[in-house]
Amino acid sequence: MIYSRSRLPSEGEILIATVKQVFDYGSYVTLDEYGGLQAFLPWSEVSSKWVKNIRDVLKENRKVVVKVIRVDRRKGTVDVSLKKVTDDERRKKNLQWKKIQRLDKILELVSQQLKLSEKDAWEQVAWKLEAKYGDPISAIERAVKEGEKILIDAGVPEIWIKPLLEEAAKHTEEKKVKMSGLITVKTSEPLGVQKIKEVMSKALENIEQDYESILNVKIYTIGAPRYRVDVVGTNPKDASEALNQIISNLIKIGKEENVDISVVKK
C-alpha cells in the first residue's frame, strides 16, 4: 500500500485515481497515492468537449490521471478534474506512477522480511529518500550501483539497508521493447489537421493505464499521409496488444469522425 505524508492532497496536484462509481452528474474516484481517499469528479470536469454519455469517457475500476481543483481541509473533501490534465502532465504522471509501483513492491517485500509494517517502510525509507534526493526509487537504484552510503546519508536506519539493496537488485529496471506500426490517415473535413489530432488523442486515452508495463506511446507523421505508431514498454506481449488496441481505436474513432485510417504495416 502506498502511504503519503499528508492526509489530503494539495490543489493543483496531479494524481492517479481509480474510478469507483459513475453517475449522470459525475463520478466518485479514489486517490491511489492517498490511501484510497475518495474524491469527486464533477460532470463539468470530465471533458473539454461535449460528451453525450459520461460512461463513454469513464468506466468503473479504470485508472485515470486527475488534477486536484478543490480541497476542503475542514470537511476532508476533495474535487478533481480530468479535463484540466494536459497530455504532457498525463504522460509524466504515468511514468512516475510506474516508479511508485516498483518502489511500493520493493518496500512491501522488505517490510515482510523484517516483520515490520509497510507504513514503517514508507516512513523510514521512502520519505527519508524523498526528502534527501527527491525521487526515492532513483535513489535506491543509485544505491544498488554505488553502495549503501546513498541510503545512510539520507538517514535510512541500518536495519533496512542490506535487505533493501538485495531486494532492489532484483527489481532493477527491465529492458525496454518497442513495437511500431505504420498507418495512412486521410480526411476531406475542412479542419482536417485538427480533426486528425483529436482522433489520435482519443485513440491513446487510457492505454498507459490499461497496460502497466507500457512506458510511452506516440503517433507521429513520417510524411503525410503516413504516420508511425510507437509503443515502448517492458513486456513484449503487452506492447503488442497495446499497439493493436491503439490501431483498432484509430480505425473505429476515425470512422466516427470521417477520417479514413488504414494499416500499412504492423
From Swiss-Prot:
Gene3D superfamilies: EIF_2_alpha (3.30.70.1130), Nucleic acid-binding proteins (2.40.50.140), Translation initiation factor 2, subunit 1, domain 2 (1.10.150.190). eIF-2 functions in the early steps of protein synthesis by forming a ternary complex with GTP and initiator tRNA. SMART domains: S1. The gene is eif2a. This is Translation initiation factor 2 subunit alpha. Keywords: Initiation factor, Protein biosynthesis, RNA-binding. Residues 12-83 form the S1 motif domain. Belongs to the eIF-2-alpha family. NCBIfam families: PRK03987.1-1. GO terms for molecular function: ribosome binding; RNA binding; translation initiation factor activity. It comes from the Archaea. The lineage of its organism: Archaea, Thermoproteota, Thermoprotei, Sulfolobales, Sulfolobaceae. Heterotrimer composed of an alpha, a beta and a gamma chain. It comes from Saccharolobus islandicus (strain Y.G.57.14 / Yellowstone #1) (Sulfolobus islandicus).
